[in-house]
Amino acid sequence: MSKILTFVKNKIIDLINNDQIKYSRVIMIEESDSLLPVDEVHANHGFDCVEMIDENISNENIEQYKTESFFTIN
């Protein structure tokens, strides 16, 4: 088990040292609404998927999209 943990730790260190892990800020829904003149907000979270958020969604469903930041691996 320690060999696996050591491997993962070393891999993460290598990714950071080689600039393959980059910090990317996620724009919150309120910020996007003021920037985009469209009905839907498209949020690309660094993956091959795009979330479409309808402004008619209730507030409890919007909470899952609110976040400060995340890490992506290129």
UniProtKB/Swiss-Prot annotation:
InterPro entries: Orthopox_F6. Pfam families: Orthopox_F6. Induction: Expressed in the early phase of the viral replicative cycle. Keywords: Early protein. It comes from the Viruses. Belongs to the orthopoxvirus OPG050 family. This is Protein OPG050. The gene is OPG050.
